Amino acid sequence: MTPRLFALIPCAGTGSRSGSAVPKQYRTLAGRALLHYTLAAFDACTEFAQTLVVLAPDDSHFDARRFAGLRFAVRRCGGGSRQASVLNGLLELAEFGATDHDWVLVHDAARPGITPELIRTLVATLKDDPVGGIVALPVADTLKRVPAGGDAIARTESRDALWQAQTPQMFRIGMLREAILRAQREGHDLTDEASAIEWAGHTPRVVQGSLRNFKVTYPEDFALAEAILARPANAS
């Protein structure tokens, strides 16, 4: 049987670094909620069996009317960290018929620049891979190491062979679940899915990402994201 595709959107964060009382995934950008752009990109990929949004149990900001017409499901099973929210979401996918052999693409709600084309490129590249992988970009900037709490440069780090991880991150549901469970048992709270897969001894691949697909994190990021989203994805 051909493995099916599922999308998982952890959306339980508060976005404290964004400088807003409203979680950043619900901020309005170019006329729509930031989360809308992620859901619309996956909705356009009709080959996906389901897109699952993981909310915090006490999320009072989510309003389904802002996402009318898009195909997705919601579960209020978010945990205290991204890793916990993703694990809880993976367990919920069984309710939609997902099996361990199926693929899941985990995507940050705060990356509204994702496009159906990038999603499909990732799937086409990795669908026959035994492990899976992520979209990422080669590091372009010069990297400086500064001690925690300080402002003096300790040294310049080589950027050779360094890539900046993005999402979606695509792995088999069973492999990812077991990798996260192992990380939890060993006391690690990892910041992305590839880290858990690596911790379990596997080797994920990288697929060329896009500058458009950056993560909205700081207050100044919203204006940049709005400018990008106001333009067609293929605009030069």
Swiss-Prot record:
Cross-referenced NCBIfam families: ispD (TIGR00453)
Keyword field: Isoprene biosynthesis, Nucleotidyltransferase, Transferase
Pfam families, per database record: IspD (PF01128)
Family (UniProt): Belongs to the IspD/TarI cytidylyltransferase family. IspD subfamily.
Function comment: Catalyzes the formation of 4-diphosphocytidyl-2-C-methyl-D-erythritol from CTP and 2-C-methyl-D-erythritol 4-phosphate (MEP).
Marked site (Transition state stabilizer) residue numbers: R17, K24
GO molecular function: 2-C-methyl-D-erythritol 4-phosphate cytidylyltransferase activity
Catalytic activity line of the entry: 2-C-methyl-D-erythritol 4-phosphate + CTP + H(+) = 4-CDP-2-C-methyl-D-erythritol + diphosphate
Name assigned to this protein: 2-C-methyl-D-erythritol 4-phosphate cytidylyltransferase
Example of a GO biological process term: isopentenyl diphosphate biosynthetic process, methylerythritol 4-phosphate pathway
Enzyme class (EC, first level): transferase
Enzyme Commission no: 2.7.7.60
Source domain of life: Bacteria
Pathway as given in its UniProt record: Isoprenoid biosynthesis; isopentenyl diphosphate biosynthesis via DXP pathway; isopentenyl diphosphate from 1-deoxy-D-xylulose 5-phosphate: step 2/6
Transmembrane region(s): none
Site (Positions MEP for the nucleophilic attack): R159, K215
